[in-house]
């Protein structure tokens, strides 16, 4: 066919394109799910056991999607001593929409102003919880295309997941993850191994532009999630089997071939059920299952059809029990952030990746294949895989990315526990004020983590102004400008901590860098 390459043609791509660095941000306060059970008057264990959730992070009216993303981007740049001119693509995945026209990415460009770097491709990508993964794929595709100019891509996934009071509220959360994408990475995207499923469904959607709350069909949402997992896993297995056959290896792919398996996590119990679901797929796909000891006791389920089992309690119970050890080995560690902070929508699955990288040594991770299932309602889903580099030596890229996340658990533990009634008051405040113009947030900034960007005001034209709570690493904004090396030998740019010019502080606010998404 004209314009097509022959199937056996080989192209030349940059080597080992993947995740070079990762940063995660979550707010400084949470509500305890056991206390929330008491406050809501539900049975003990409904949230903690039934959903598998221990704590739920939330933000006050001082934080919005722009401030979350400003914070996580600047923290990634600072932690890795990166210059802002080394970014050639910046894309945001989010479903937290505060402006139907102006992108979150355009707000983030304020961090790049003093560097003079405005030649940055990318924009916002939205489809429920899948937008972050779509942005990641766009970044990888850019680096592997003729458009690539040799610089890094930066992907930001972030959301504020909140629900109206009721059964869905304990499945909320908030957070953002920034991923630096480039060649020679320690966590590499497996080329040609994506299993995708797209379908029209009204399982979860947000049609009311004046509300942050979604419309949710809980039962349909679970069915859509599990059916998408079935389809994506089937496509992935076919693609990797085809690759293996080209390499002379004739075998079926199973869960055992993943070193780790991570999922988009609306709540932890669904992830455990999903791992069991993949085990069910392996079982039904194994022509010799009667001879395989790992399926002992499951013989009665040999004739079930996947589409008939979404809510079959007997199947669910049997395969969760049979896959319990696999869950402990391959998935349980990935639920640290989800269990302690809740659902972060687009950044949820990348919080799971951060959890794995934070809890295993480079030596334990080296050479492992990580399965990743990303799901967004509506619906869009992909199962793909990452391959961890073999180089786990001190000072290696793998050593650096794990070291940068080693404080994850202590950061989660350093948050402040807030009483359920205070949490409910904050949710009501957001409900009443998130859409207002000419608004000054009411909550204090004193409880914010150092280095957190926060909302200062929304003016009469809905233009938002932000400031950053000073960090001990900032020293003084008046003590000259620190320098970090760019990726060229002759250039220097101001340190990321000094990117934004300081404006006079508003009444009652500490002096700090201030930026606005309106006129300066």
Swiss-Prot record:
Localization annotation: Cytoplasm
Amino-acid positions noted as binding (3S)-3-hydroxy-3-methylglutaryl-CoA in the UniProt annotation, renumbered to this chain: 43-44, 129, 167, 171, 221, 264, 273, 343, 377
GO cellular component: cytoplasm
Modified residues (Phosphoserine): 4, 495, 516
Region described as Disordered: spans on this chain: 487-520
Pathway membership: Metabolic intermediate biosynthesis; (R)-mevalonate biosynthesis; (R)-mevalonate from acetyl-CoA: step 2/3
Catalysed reactions, semicolon-separated: acetoacetyl-CoA + acetyl-CoA + H2O = (3S)-3-hydroxy-3-methylglutaryl-CoA + CoA + H(+)
Family: Belongs to the thiolase-like superfamily. HMG-CoA synthase family.
Species the sequence originates in: Rattus norvegicus
Domain of life: Eukaryota
GO annotation, biological process: acetyl-CoA metabolic process; cellular response to cholesterol; cellular response to follicle-stimulating hormone stimulus; cellular response to low-density lipoprotein particle stimulus; cholesterol biosynthetic process; farnesyl diphosphate biosynthetic process, mevalonate pathway; liver development; male gonad development
Keyword list, A-Z: Acetylation, Cholesterol biosynthesis, Cholesterol metabolism, Cytoplasm, Lipid biosynthesis, Lipid metabolism, Phosphoprotein, Steroid biosynthesis, Steroid metabolism, Sterol biosynthesis, Sterol metabolism, Transferase
Residues annotated as catalytic: 95 (proton donor/acceptor), 129 (acyl-thioester intermediate), 264 (proton donor/acceptor)
Identification of the protein by name: Hydroxymethylglutaryl-CoA synthase, cytoplasmic
Annotated residues for binding of CoA: 44-46, 167, 221, 269, 273
InterPro entries per UniProt: HMG_CoA_synt_AS, HMG_CoA_synt_C_dom, HMG_CoA_synth_N, HMG_CoA_synthase_euk, Thiolase-like
